[in-house]
């Protein structure tokens, strides 16, 4: 029950109501979001000491609006009024101090002492999400502004209990929705053929890093993951033998402390070539085939994908998890499990299907290839005869030409017309040709020359490899040289010989089984000449590329070197007598210029 009003209050109430009616637009502006849907534009009302709750019920009943009134709303009203329903309601609220709020269905009215405040924690949701949700639902009211803290994800709302409860419920739903959207799961994708983790292979004296599936996915999706450790690699023809126990040496004095970048070391070479300087002063190593272009420093392994290596080394790149750069909050986490050769991905559930589809397309079974290599040495004169014999075979004829000294050779195979279709890039004066079935005919002719001691097959290695995986065939000699320093001595190994590297790639969709061969040949010899007691290495390098069909061969010729031979014939016993022993010896020195040929034949073992 509302308390009885005094006589003075009853007399002042109509005057105060009229005064507040004129000041209402300036004191209490209302927003469209809280606008009550009144049915008439004018409201006429006469009251004589009538209870305020009854007046409010009469107002809502005349406009067909459901109303809830708190018992804390008290007072009486007297007077005659003719104004709009909204202005009449605002006038009463300003006069008697109650607060009202329309939630879209019910007009709710509370007493002045019932207002409250609430602090809303949004969790992972942003304050913009709550602000947009209130605007879409038309629940934002400038009479009860919500204060936001974007950094802390917190909002504070003050107003009538119903409004505060409504905003709190909406904030809770927004926070739960954001938590569900940010929920992640972990899935394991088992690989069958591809490598999950980065792996390092040693090619040509270098540690070449091959990115795995995890690195590929991280580079595409900007994901987080563990960086790959750098593995140093020495040069191609010489390397430093690590001391037992991991102790450091000081062979080159100040160079070991990073001060000898410009000093000369063994054989007049910079000391940094022997690992004595910092990584920034070392000789850069070259990437794998085709063997040209800039590469990483020797302090880190070369990579067949320079873009990925750069991304792992650059600290400003968000892909590098070890660089300290901040990543996007929704960035996935991709890791490799080398033990099971699997990929572990933590991300949102709706993205997992796209990962599975991409991994399935990349994890395809590579073809198994076989590379047959034949290294042939032919005397210079015999090489010219050989060139006359096999050079003039064509597609439709089988005519053997020569100088008449060689016998007639049979050839039953059909000659391939694609013998000149190879796209080759020979170096210098080296002859590079693609042979069809005539490759077997060439071997027949070489066998004939071998019987006359004019040619010999040095080696015929065969190696199996996978598609797009480099095959390496090395036949080298090593010599270890001891180099004394100020306080210790180091061993350096010098290597020389034949290194044949072939990278085969099957052309997809080729009807003839066409393959691309990237070939790099390094041929070196430890010469008889020495510098400071260290043998001089003479080396040559050939780099070429060619497209070869199934059954064809790639011939690389024109590489010559001089071979010296010394024969000694002596009578046992007498030839060892001092002074007169030379009368019973016979020495014969001969020099021969040899031509070296490389014949490569690729085969597809399993498609």
From Swiss-Prot:
Residue numbers spanned by region Disordered: 277-332
Coarse class of the protein's main subcellular location: membrane
One Gene Ontology term from the biological process aspect of the record: symbiont-mediated perturbation of host programmed cell death
Start-end of Low complexity biased regions: 291-306
Transmembrane segment boundaries: none
Keywords: Cell outer membrane, Hypersensitive response elicitation, Membrane, Protein transport, Signal, Translocation, Transport, Virulence
Record's subcellular location: Cell outer membrane
Pfam family, one: T3S_SPI-1_N0
InterPro entries (UniProt xref): Bact_Secretion_Sys_Channel (IPR050810), NolW-like (IPR005644), NolW-like_sf (IPR038591), T2SS/T3SS_dom (IPR004846), T2SS_GspD_CS (IPR004845), T3S_SPI-1_N0 (IPR049034), T3SS_OM_pore_YscC (IPR003522)
Secretion signal, residue range per the UniProt entry: 1-33
Disulphide connectivity of cysteines: none
GO CC annotation: cell outer membrane; type II protein secretion system complex; type III protein secretion system complex
Primary role: Component of the type III secretion system (T3SS), also called injectisome, which is used to inject bacterial effector proteins into eukaryotic host cells. Forms a ring-shaped multimeric structure with an apparent central pore in the outer membrane. Necessary for both basic pathogenicity and the induction of the hypersensitive response in resistant plants.
Subunit structure: The core secretion machinery of the T3SS is composed of approximately 20 different proteins, including cytoplasmic components, a base, an export apparatus and a needle. This subunit is part of the base, which anchors the injectisome in the bacterial cell envelope. Forms a stable homooligomeric complex.
Protein family per UniProt: Belongs to the bacterial secretin family. T3SS SctC subfamily.
Name this polypeptide is given: Type 3 secretion system secretin
Species annotation: Xanthomonas euvesicatoria
Classification lineage: Bacteria, Pseudomonadati, Pseudomonadota, Gammaproteobacteria, Lysobacterales
Record gene name: sctC
């Amino acid at each position: 029950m509302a308390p009885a009003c005094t006589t003075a209050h009853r007399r002042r109430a109509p005057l105060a109501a009229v005064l507040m009616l004129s000041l209402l637009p300036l004191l209490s502006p209302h927003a469209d979001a809280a606008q009550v849907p009144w049915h008439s534009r004018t409201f006429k009302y006469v009251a004589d000491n009538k209870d305020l709750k009854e007046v409010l019920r009469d107002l809502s009943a005349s406009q067909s609006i459901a109303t809830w009134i708190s018992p804390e709303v008290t007072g009486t009203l007297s007077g005659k009024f003719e104004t709009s329903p909204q202005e009449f309601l605002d006038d009463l609220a300003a006069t008697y101090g109650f607060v009202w709020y329309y939630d879209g269905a019910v007009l709710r009215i509370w007493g002045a002492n019932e207002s409250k405040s609430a602090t809303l924690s949004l969790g992972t949701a942003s304050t913009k999400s709550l602000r947009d949700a209130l605007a879409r639902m038309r629940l934002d009211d400038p009479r009860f502004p919500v204060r936001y803290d974007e950094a802390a994800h917190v909002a504070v709302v003050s107003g009538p209990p119903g409004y505060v409860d409504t905003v709190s419920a909406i904030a809770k739903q927004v926070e739960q929705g954001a938590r569900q959207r940010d929920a992640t799961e972990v899935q394991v994708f088992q690989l069958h053929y591809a490598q999950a983790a980065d792996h390092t292979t040693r090619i040509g004296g270098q540690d070449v890093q091959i990115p795995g599936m995890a690195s590929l996915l991280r580079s595409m999706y900007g994901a987080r993951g563990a960086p790959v450790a750098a593995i140093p690699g020495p040069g191609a023809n010489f390397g430093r033998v690590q001391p037992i126990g991991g102790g450091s040496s000081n062979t080159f004095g100040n160079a070991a402390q990073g001060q000898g970048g410009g000093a000369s070391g063994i054989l007049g070479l910079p000391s940094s070539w022997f690992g004595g300087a910092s990584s920034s002063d070392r000789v850069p190593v070259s990437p794998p085939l085709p063997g040209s272009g800039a590469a990483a420093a020797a302090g880190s392994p070369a990579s067949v994908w320079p873009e990925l290596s750069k991304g792992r080394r650059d600290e400003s790149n968000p892909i590098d998890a070890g660089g300290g750069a901040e990543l996007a909050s929704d960035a996935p986490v991709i890791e490799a499990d080398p033990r099971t050769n699997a990929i572990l991905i933590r991300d949102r559930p709706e993205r997992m299907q796209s990962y599975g589809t991409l991994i399935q397309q990349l994890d395809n079974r590579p073809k198994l290839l076989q590379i047959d290599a034949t290294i042939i040495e032919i005397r210079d004169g015999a090489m010219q005869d050989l060139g006359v014999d096999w050079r003039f075979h064509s597609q439709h004829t089988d005519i053997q030409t020569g100088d008449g000294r060689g016998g007639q050779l049979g050839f039953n195979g059909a000659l391939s017309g694609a013998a000149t279709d190879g796209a080759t890039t020979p170096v210098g004066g080296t002859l590079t040709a693609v042979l069809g079935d005539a490759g077997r005919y060439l071997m027949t002719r070489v066998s004939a020359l071998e019987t006359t001691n004019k040619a010999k097959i040095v080696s015929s290695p065969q190696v199996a490899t996978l598609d797009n995986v480099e095959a390496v065939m090395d036949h080298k000699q090593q010599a270890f040289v001891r180099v004394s320093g100020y306080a210790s001595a180091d061993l350096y190994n010098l290597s020389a010989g034949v290194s044949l590297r072939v990278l085969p790639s099957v052309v997809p969709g080729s009807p003839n089984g066409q393959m691309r061969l990237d070939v790099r040949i390094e041929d070196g010899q430890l010469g008889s000449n020495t510098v400071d007691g260290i043998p001089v290495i003479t080396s040559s390098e050939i780099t070429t590329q060619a497209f070869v069909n199934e059954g064809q061969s790639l011939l690389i010729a024109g590489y010559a070197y001089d071979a010296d031979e010394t024969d000694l014939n002596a009578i046992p016993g007498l030839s060892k007598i001092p002074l007169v022993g030379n009368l019973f010896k016979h020495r014969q020195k001969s020099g021969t210029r040899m031509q070296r040929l490389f014949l490569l034949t690729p085969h597809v073992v399993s498609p």
